[in-house]
Regions:
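Auxiliary alpha/beta "docking" domains used to position bulky ligands
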Residues: 1-159, 166
Length: 168
């Protein structure tokens, strides 16, 4: 059986991701988070407050191979929120992600389509939308989707335009 090389798979993945509406698609090696020690210290100090789930299996959060054994690559995608228009004068402002439908379900459906494509190539994968035990900002930065700002949010430049965006 002839299998395509990784660049063919990556090109196919990114082309399909654009068709699904993702604005960015990047791939990097699956490596342990450079901020692992900071996370462990943060947890030891009890700074996770009532988020007890953060303290369960912190190693899984910092190493993709702990989440998916044999993992070799991390795929990071960006998706621009729809902006239905400017808010009326005198009204309070609401974050863009809160204007429309809950993005978790929308993006999970799109990820399912991408996972189907990767399965054709024999890949095993896990997809998360702000819900998995992964340090997504570290992976997105390693993939080249953007850089970490002072706020800790990832600032990225859209593939479609040279405008900086903030995501968290």
């Amino acid at each position: 059986m002839l299998t395509p090389d990784s660049s063919v798979i990556k090109d196919s993945l990114c082309a399909v991701s654009r068709q699904l509406g993702f604005s960015g698609c990047r791939v990097a090696r699956a490596e342990k988070s450079p901020h692992a020690e900071k996370l462990f210290q943060w947890l030891e100090r009890g700074w996770h407050a009532g988020m007890e789930w953060m303290a369960r299996s912190p190693e899984r959060r910092t190493d993709p191979a702990e989440v998916l054994p044999g993992c070799r690559s991390v795929i990071c995608l960006s998706y621009d929120y729809d902006s239905p228009g400017r808010r009326p004068e005198g009204e309070g402002s609401i974050c863009l992600y809160a204007h429309g439908k809950d993005y978790h379900g929308i993006l999970e459906e799109k990820l399912a389509d991408l996972q189907e494509l990767l399965s054709i190539y024999g890949g095993k994968q896990r997809g998360y939308v702000d819900s998995g035990p992964v340090m997504e900002r570290d992976h997105a930065e390693a993939c080249g989707l953007g850089w970490r700002g002072k706020s800790g949010c990832l600032l990225y430049t859209s593939d479609a335009a040279d405008e900086a965006r903030s995501v968290d």
